[in-house]
Amino acid sequence: MAEVSVKQLATDIDTPVDRLLQQFVDAGISKSKADDMVSESEKQTLLAHLKKQHGGDEVAAPARMTLQRKTKSTISVQGTGGKNKEVQVEVRKSRTYVRRSALEDEQRQAEAEETARLEAEEKARREAEEKARLDAEEKARREAEQARREAEEKARIEAQQKARQAQQPAKAAGSTAQQEAEKMAKREAEELKRQQEQAALTKAEELAAKKAEEARVMAEQNAARWAEEEAARAKESSDYHLTTNKHAQAAEDELDRKEETSRRTAAAAKGPKKAGRREDDRDARNPRARKGKRGKVATPNAMKHGFNKPAAAVNRDVVIGETITVAELANKMAVKGVEVIKVMMKMGAMATINQVIDQETAQLVAEEMGHKVVLRRENELEEAVLSDRDETSEAKPRAPVVTIMGHVDHGKTSLLDYIRKAKVAAGEAGGITQHIGAYHVETDSGMITFLDTPGHAAFTSMRARGAKATDIVVLVVAADDGVMPQTIEAIQHAKAAEVPLVVAVNKIDKPEADPDRVKTELARYNVMSEDWGGDCQFVHVSAKSGQGIDDLLEAILIQSEVLELKAVVDGMANGVVIESFLDKGRGPVATVLVQEGTLRQGDIVLCGLEYGRVRAMRDELGREIKEAGPSLPVEILGLSGVPSAGDEATVVRDEKKAREVALYRQGKFREVKLARQQKAKLENMFANMTEGEVSEVNVVIKADVQGSVEAICDALVKLSTDEVKVKIVGSGVGGITETDATLAAASSAILVGFNVRADASARKVIEAESLDLRYYSVIYDLIDEVKQAMSGMLAPEYRQEIIGLAEVRSVFKSPKFGAVAGCMVTEGVVKRSNRIRVLRDNVVIYEGELESLRRFKDDVNEVKNGYECGIAVKNYNDVREGDQIEVYETVEIQRTL
């Protein structure tokens, strides 16, 4: 919604502007003038603030609600004497629901109380530590003062003694010796005082640290005990299933005790048994003496098992994979499948016992039944293999990967051809590119890797793959043709991959070239030139004369410097499959663009659903190489099969693990494919009902590379209409084999070979079965011929053309034909074999056929314009003068797509 001003909003809600500005300020939104604009998010913020201010968020609902359910049932219990009696069983269940806001308030209150308690404990601990420290310091100070006084007294006494001793032998030097003795005594007293103070201070610090440690340990012990008590209370309140099971078991045991008491009371009321014999002993000695209904021998008590029901529910660790059936889940939890289905129905999910459920649903069900869930990923091996890599080296600058994109016949391959100084466009059938070509060229400023993509509309997936694996997209636009559909699609691919664009305006040397028109048309799709303030470089080039090629390469290198492209050179390689095909002599061949690391001959490569050891590597010119670094395209041999274009190629350590991962991926791919085929949705029901009325053209496609197979399949499927559908019975890479021919014969399909041929065994089957085999090298021709085949299966269209018109001049009566109209042919010709319409006042009143056409009593086959004739209409006698008889014929028109 568009923004509105504060004044307009105040008018809409009928409130003064000053009040609305104050409300904005209260809500935390800075609005000071009536002309300020208000966005939709600010309106929502103001509305939420006003609701909260006026109590609009509160819901008038009870904070706690208890629901009670009572079910009654009757069970048949076998009593004494073989008679059954009916026992009424009543089960009462109670469940309490608490409003989330009330729970949150209680939780917040509990958290506040817990925080206050912890703060009080922390404060008490700090006070205890501070008190202990002050006591220790005071005690140390007193001890130091006492030690100082003792030291001074001791020093004074020793000084007096030394003075007296010095006076006896030498009274002549009395004054000088006495002064020196006093100085020495004073120094000794000060040293002793300092040592005693230091010892007292150290002792006080140790005592304070010890008391602080004791206080901390006491606080930690109390905190752990309090946390355990809190967790126990929370667990007891949250474990709903355990408490429910306990109550159910207690109720069941109480019911069993009541039944046993009533049965014993009834048996005692019948009278005492004969003395001297116990019934249990007699039954144990002679089992046949105790017979039940229909004379069957009852089971002795000694043969009955002594199993007791568990007193509480057993909580298990349930291991759940990515998918699991309901029966397997019930088996892991040791419950019946019916119980699991009941829980799922309560949760709102309908399932059968053999239905496969996903991991999240199974986790919810298991936790609902009180078990602990252990989730297991089935692709753990795959993740472990892909994560076991040595990528410790630092990243270094690498060459840019540039994709050439644009509309068909705009000169993409010719431009690249001039750069590579080789003739490639002439080698492509029809002069159009039908494969992704990967090449690298050395320039004066460095290496550049080019990917040449097809421009034809059928190769959308190829162009998307090229944009995904690239760093820079060069958009080639013909200066004389302008922006075309595939140009727009290339812009969309580049923006989806977030790749910068460099626009090359080609064919600039033509007289009708108009580069300004190209800039204007591209500006509609947010591709702005740097001259117009945008961020896209526009380079005028000519693939024919070579004009502007150096400028284009310089623009590419400048863009790559801005991107600061780096990659790990050393270590295990990682890349993407650009193209793949099946070579008759070499086997599966994949063109891989190395993105990081170094790919070496002999490495083990995991590539999508395939794996293998690299037996040989070749560059784009067919030369054997031993290793390839980042941004280099190479052909590798040695894979187990043809990988899909766009798959990630990764070097791994162990070939055995790579094989396991590839087999796991193949199994998952097969499961997904089968699930997609078997999924019958409600919206497809009517389409399936009318499926028998739709004609189908079955096609078996074989091509030279995987990308061409995808492009042809997509293009043919898009040709399908409501009346005729194209069904791809089979597709693959490589020559046409006997298996393909047999498949085409079984499904009455057309065999299509795109740049491939049939082998000898396949040709025998084709001749024997008279199959329709067609070879193509240009995708245009293939699509056109399939269109013609589909047109032949369309139901024809019928059109009615008026060939004559006769006017009734008079009406005669005939005993044989009834009313006969005497007519004048005014337009065209009246033929006896065609159908007619009778018009009165230009309104059709009858439609039928002629019974008789005569001229002068002679039967004729046709009467031309300007002649009179007699016309008898079959089964119609209400012909009047002035009516018109219109003669028409039905023409069949063949429809086309």
Curated annotation (Swiss-Prot):
It is found in: Cytoplasm. Its main location: cytoplasm. Residues 406-413 are annotated as: G1. The keyword Coiled coil does not apply. One of its GO terms (cellular component) is cytosol. InterPro entries: DNA-bd_dom_put_sf (IPR009061), EF-G-like_DII (IPR053905), EFTu-like_2 (IPR004161), IF2_assoc_dom_bac (IPR013575), IF2_II (IPR044145), IF2_N (IPR006847), P-loop_NTPase (IPR027417), Small_GTP-bd (IPR005225). GTP binds at residues 406-413, 452-456, 506-509. Coiled coil: none annotated. PROSITE patterns: G_TR_2 (PS51722), IF2 (PS01176). Residues 287-296 have a biased composition (Basic residues). Residues 101-161, 180-196, 203-217, 226-239, 277-286 have a biased composition (Basic and acidic residues). Residues 506-509 are annotated as: G4. Residues 431-435 are annotated as: G2. Residues 162-179 have a biased composition (Low complexity). Residues 542-544 are annotated as: G5. Keywords: Cytoplasm, GTP-binding, Initiation factor, Nucleotide-binding, Protein biosynthesis. Residues 69-88, 95-304 are annotated as: Disordered. GO terms for molecular function: GTP binding; GTPase activity; guanosine tetraphosphate binding; translation initiation factor activity. Residues 452-455 are annotated as: G3. Pfam families: EF-G_D2, GTP_EFTU, GTP_EFTU_D2, IF-2, IF2_assoc, IF2_N. Residues 397-566 form the tr-type G domain. HAMAP family: IF_2_B. One of the essential components for the initiation of protein synthesis. Protects formylmethionyl-tRNA from spontaneous hydrolysis and promotes its binding to the 30S ribosomal subunits. Also involved in the hydrolysis of GTP during the formation of the 70S ribosomal complex. PANTHER family: TR-TYPE G DOMAIN-CONTAINING PROTEIN, TRANSLATION INITIATION FACTOR IF-2-RELATED. This is Translation initiation factor IF-2.
